């Protein structure tokens, strides 16, 4: 199973992590405990209530969710419409 998403803000990050957690049928408390965070902190992240979230904490949550961090140039991913145009109208 491949899971790819693009995020540019901390609220988008929280939403993406929540989606992945739910996809894996994990509870916030499980992910929080395994990553060394409080459930309240993970909840605030998932609900877009944080303005900062440390790299170590992020790496711990990603590990629990079976994810890794990848960097892409802004705009390099393109859109579905751009992909369709490149492929002659089908995607």
Describe each PLM feature range.
Residues 55-71:
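DNA major-groove recognition helix of helix-turn-helix/homeodomain DNA-binding modules
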Residues 9, 41-44, 58-61:
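Residue-level recognition of specific faces of alpha-helices
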Residues 36-51:
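Recognition helix of helix-turn-helix/homeodomain-like DNA-binding domains
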Residues 1-23:
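A short, Lys/Arg-rich alpha-helix, primarily the initiator
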Residues 15-32, 89-91:
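Short basic helix-loop element that most often maps to the first helix and adjoining turn
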Residues 12-13, 27, 35-37, 66, ...:
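Hydrophobic/basic alpha-helical segments enriched in Actinobacteria
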């Amino acid at each position: 199973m491949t899971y790819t998403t693009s995020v540019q803000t901390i609220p988008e990050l929280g939403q993406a992590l929540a989606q992945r957690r739910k996809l894996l049928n994990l509870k916030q408390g499980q992910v929080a405990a395994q990553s060394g965070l409080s459930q309240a902190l993970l909840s605030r992240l998932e609900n877009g209530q944080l303005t900062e979230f440390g790299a170590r904490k992020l790496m711990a949550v990603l590990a629990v969710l079976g994810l890794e961090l990848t960097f892409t140039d802004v705009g390099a991913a393109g859109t579905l419409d751009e992909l369709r145009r490149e492929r002659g109208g089908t995607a």
